Design a protein with these regions (language model features):
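Solvent-exposed loop/turn segments connecting transmembrane beta-strands
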Residues: 16-23, 46-55, 83-89, 119-126, ...
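Transmembrane beta-strands of outer-membrane beta-barrel pores
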Residues: 42-48, 76-82, 102-106, 115-119, ...
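Bacterial Sec-dependent N-terminal signal peptides
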Residues: 1-20
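Outer-membrane beta-barrel "beta-signal"
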Residues: 98, 197-201
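Residue-level signature of outer-membrane beta-barrel architecture
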Residues: 30, 64, 100-102, 136-138, ...
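Repeated loop/turn-to-beta-strand initiation elements of outer-membrane beta-barrel proteins
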Residues: 35-40, 69-74, 105-109, 140-144, ...
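Outer-membrane beta-barrel architecture
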Residues: 27, 61, 97-99, 131-135, ...
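Start-of-domain marker
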Residues: 16-65, 71
Length: 201
């Protein structure tokens, strides 16, 4: 309980700038072996209440199922971002992650820990992202609702592992075919001085 109160209070002491955005993603996963999967995707994000494109993104990655309950992964992303008066700029990111998962009857639980390093030639940003996710497999229904909470901790020298961002997300996944799946979601993102409401697919 004290931890929850600390996280909430850290984002509620100052007036926040608000924004509404959309995120659109299209990607694929392909199993090279039963335990090894490669993936890739394209991303488009908006900002300023849908008025401007925020960024385009390209990502590739792979994951390996080390144990029935443990998956390890790594990946690379590049972002082409709208920096306003500074124009459009590239930045790059690599990530390393591990995911623990379990199933209790129809309830699916997972905990993912992700280290990421983001850089643009001028600034390096190091983050540890911790995400807890809950999903429910509805009997005789293809829809699968889920909810997750994710915390970003700063790893740069002066950040002292402080909470830099929180994301609360709820959505529904729907298989469209044997190889395609849709994910429709709403996400509330909190930072120290801004809040963002996001609808995505």
């Amino acid at each position: 309980m004290p931890i929850v109160l600390w996280v909430v209070s850290s984002f509620s002491l100052r007036a926040q700038e608000k924004d509404f955005a959309t995120w659109a993603n299209a990607g694929f996963e392909y199993k090279l072996k039963p335990a090894f999967t490669v993936s890739g995707g394209l991303e488009w994000r908006t900002k300023d209440d849908l008025g401007k494109t925020d960024r385009w993104g390209l990502k590739v990655g792979g994951s390996y199922k080390l144990l029935p309950f443990l998956k390890l992964g790594a990946g690379y992303e590049t972002h082409y971002r709208n920096r306003g008066a500074d124009g459009w700029k590239f930045r790059h990111r690599y990530r390393l992650e591990g995911t623990l998962s379990a199933r209790v009857q129809r309830v699916k639980l997972s905990l993912r820990e992700r280290f990421q390093h983001t850089f643009d030639g001028h600034r390096d940003e190091f983050r540890l992202r911790s995400r807890a996710k809950f999903a429910y497999d509805i009997p005789k229904c293809k829809l699968e609702p889920y909810a997750s909470a994710e915390m970003y901790n700063g790893l740069n020298k002066t950040e002292h592992f402080g909470v830099k961002r929180m994301r609360y997300r709820g959505g529904i996944t729907l298989p469209l075919s044997e190889r395609w799946e849709a994910d429709i979601f709403y996400c509330r993102q909190w930072e120290k001085d801004k809040r963002k409401d996001i609808v995505g697919v």
